[in-house]
């Protein structure tokens, strides 16, 4: 009886910790009428990505060690043609790519003359997809640095929200490199 009860208690405690962690993560507030910190044109100046692979529409907030970016998901996104025509769902790898682009903007924002640098992602860990992203959704990305940039290497944790719900999360390691 003791061992069985102990196992049940452990499962319950794990589930409680998981629920508490999910509720501690707050979605950033987003007012679509507020002027962005970076618009799509400024993002194009900093990132090498172009349509259809530029996956950040605007940045609404930048702090010393965090950034909040936006991606509006429309029915016209090219990936919906094949993923999936009858029930369009944004591919998880593209959610992670969009989050990485927001993280790249955070890293670039920390250097002088960011146009002269690029970020390259070296590692992505702990990726979790929690909910489907579909046409009509607005993804709000919050990415924060876990430690100061050292030797051109940055570690970050990112969350993607639709409304108040976390739809994706991941940890990243990126290198900042001067362009040739």
Where are these regions (language model features)?
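Active-site helix/loop of acyl-thioester processing domains in fatty-acid/polyketide metabolism
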Residues: 59, 90-114
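Catalytic strand-loop segment that frames the active site of acyl-thioester-processing enzymes
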Residues: 51-90
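Short aromatic-glycine motifs in intrinsically disordered, low-complexity regions
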Residues: 38-50, 116
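Hydrophobic core residues within well-ordered beta-strands of beta-rich domains
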Residues: 53-55, 139, 154
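Hydrophobic residues on conserved beta-strands that form the core of alpha/beta folds
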Residues: 56-57, 124, 155, 169
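HotDog/MaoC-like acyl-thioester-processing domains
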Residues: 3-25, 29-31, 35-36, 48, ...
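Hydrophobic beta-strand-centered segment that forms part of the acyl-chain substrate-binding groove
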Residues: 35-37, 103-142, 167, 174
